[in-house]
A protein has these predicted regions:
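Asp-box/BNR beta-propeller blade signature and adjacent active/binding-site loops
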Residues: 1-132
Length: 132
């Protein structure tokens, strides 16, 4: 049965995985508030991770993987035999953010075109980071 996670997030994809050799769930998501005027209803930064040891009924934030005046989205994750996670995601400038805060005005056409300067990112996260 579906239920709310109680985690704040804009319009952005998440990535849910089970920690290898464990019943714990790991969620990667954008830990930011809903902003109705923003083009994705909130800032897609930071890219964060949370763990659930009760089947997703409650979540504890572990930490941030990346952050900045950018959009961090299209998350994918696979675990290696060592238990380390390989997290891939897209990083692109968000002209509506200044110093981590929504500036309150819509981006210009030129600023939106700059969003096509995208980087594919990869992070290698050791297994023990999830259970620190």
């Amino acid at each position: 049965r579906a239920r709310t996670s109680t985690l704040s997030s804009p319009e952005s994809c998440t990535c849910l995985r089970r920690l290898p050799d464990s019943e714990d769930l790991i969620l990667f998501w954008n830990d930011s508030e809903y902003i109705s005027d923003h083009h994705h209803f909130g800032i897609r930064s930071p890219l964060s991770a949370a763990i659930s040891s009760d089947g997703g009924r409650s979540w504890n934030k572990i930490g941030d993987i990346d952050a900045g005046d950018c959009m961090l989205t299209n998350i994918g994750c696979t675990f290696l035999s060592s238990g380390a996670a390989v997290l891939t995601y897209l990083k692109t400038p968000d002209p509506e953010i200044e110093n981590g805060v929504y500036r309150g005005t819509r981006s210009t056409k030129a600023e939106r075109e700059a969003q096509f300067e995208m980087e594919l990112m990869a992070a290698l996260i050791p297994r023990d980071w999830f259970t620190q």
